[in-house]
Amino acid sequence: MKRCYITTPIYYASGKPHIGHAFTTILADVIKRYKQQNGYEAYFLTGTDEHGNKIESKAKSLGLDPQTFVDQNVAYFQQMWKQLDINFDHFIRTTDLSHKAQVQHAFQLLYDKGLIYQSNWEGAYCVECEQNYFTYDKQTMLCEIGHQLTLVQEPSLFIAFKDSKDWIGEMIATNKLNITPESRAAELKNNFLDGGLNDLALTRQNVTWGIPVPFDNKQTIYVWFDALFNYITNLGFAHNDPKFNKWWNNNDEEHEVIHLISREITRFHCIYWPIFLHQLGFKLPTQFLSHGWIVDGNGHKMSKSLGNVISPEELLAQFGVDGTRYCLLKEMRLDKDNRCSMAIFKDIYNADLANSFGNHASRTFGMIKKYLGGQLDFIEVQDPQVKQLMDQANQAMVQFDTAWNNFQFYKGINGLLQLVFQASKLIDQLKPWELVKQTDYTLLKQLLFACVRCTQVCFVLLAPILVHTSTQIFDLFNFSAQARSKTHLADPQQLQKISLAPVIQPLFKRLD
């Protein structure tokens, strides 16, 4: 059976979830649902990264112990994912005892292979990013995304990359890691590999909130090493859990492992993580999806200090669950930084959901109710203009899958928007209200059947995003189980008997 293991990065539990967390997690949820629609068995992992100096410092400033602090923040994440209808299979926490034991096991394995050695770390450290810097601006003392750097000099255990430099360089130069968009691979090569890949310090001495080194409890394992291994600790890799071979370490050609990440953490996931896996003899993920930054309407990166952050709560209050999921997925592209504002999302909501998809479904429902008493049986379409619309529905399905399989979600959606536009245009041309007066019920039924077909195609394909509205539409038109299924979508004969619900509830109310 085809399988797909989808992961988000585990989010740093130093505060509440923000719009970037919401986008990545919605994207993972939509991919999971889409894969399941297409016959895959899918497993979706998300969670929280809970160790490190930043957590410890923030907890202390609030008069809390670190565990209490992260417990509070984890609850915010779990509640938000519930509100957004995120259907994950496992929520991992790096404070889980099983995770900690398995991270120590991985560390010990690498040490036993002679890949970890004692030396001294000297350079700059960003507490906010939990990241070391060999090179940095000595004037500003800011990291690459603007956080304050601290000079550090301390003994540390390092992992040797000398036998992996050429390997990872070739993997990235030829994009054998399958990084999307491909421009991210070029960024990694230019920014991190061309100048030489330094060995990585894997431990800190003065951080107590973390996982101790298994053979030296005076040192704590680097938070990024700890965090990256969540993708296989949740599968019980160190315990011979069958889940590890099922979802990760197998040779099935139809098996996919997709890591969703944001641009600023691509280096850790696409350089260090593949090296660790390679050194341990484990398989690599099959796909890395690295989306750009989320910026405000003026192109500025969102940050609390600039006061331009949009919270998921604001989006939910304005657009509801389906509206929030749709606006984020429609607007966000993987190949660029994405401008976001409440005004931009409002325009998308009104144009796409209220005026296009919602209006088409409501209009189709209303015409069948008014002109045909709410009943419509399957009919062979003969009229050339209506047949052209039916053909366009079939083409939209193919184009949608092509786009989504290439993670170009907006392209697939735009094809469906074009479909309902053409349906609206045909309604205005054929004037069903005139067909009734002329008692031309043959053409009327063909037109309305094609409109139902367009409704079916749009809302079956959009069901991974519009989880509530799609079901509402299916119920309004009394679609059979087969008519609601992607498996049978290519066959319009699944629409054998349309019997409308008594009344239609508002779908997407236009926002002023």
UniProtKB/Swiss-Prot annotation:
Keyword Protein biosynthesis: yes
EC numbers on record: 6.1.1.10
InterPro entries according to UniProt: Met-tRNA_synth (IPR014758), Met-tRNA_synth_2 (IPR023457), Methionyl/Leucyl_tRNA_Synth (IPR015413), MetRS_core (IPR033911), Rossmann-like_a/b/a_fold (IPR014729), tRNAsynth_Ia_anticodon-bd (IPR009080)
Transmembrane regions listed in the UniProt entry: none
Binding site for ATP: K304
Catalysed reactions, semicolon-separated: tRNA(Met) + L-methionine + ATP = L-methionyl-tRNA(Met) + AMP + diphosphate
Localization (cell): Cytoplasm
Entries under SUPFAM superfamilies matching the protein: Anticodon-binding domain of a subclass of class I aminoacyl-tRNA synthetases, Nucleotidylyl transferase
Cofactor: Zn(2+)
GO biological process terms on file: methionyl-tRNA aminoacylation
Motif mapping: 'HIGH' region: 11-21
Motif ('KMSKS' region): 301-305
Keyword Cell membrane: no
GO cellular component: cytoplasm
Main location class: cytoplasm
Record's cofactor remark: Binds 1 zinc ion per subunit.
Function noted in UniProt: Is required not only for elongation of protein synthesis but also for the initiation of all mRNA translation through initiator tRNA(fMet) aminoacylation.
Listed NCBIfam families: metG
Subunit-structure text: Monomer.
Family the entry assigns: Belongs to the class-I aminoacyl-tRNA synthetase family. MetG type 2A subfamily.
Name of the protein in question: Methionine--tRNA ligase
Species for this entry: Mycoplasma pneumoniae (strain ATCC 29342 / M129 / Subtype 1)
Gene: metG
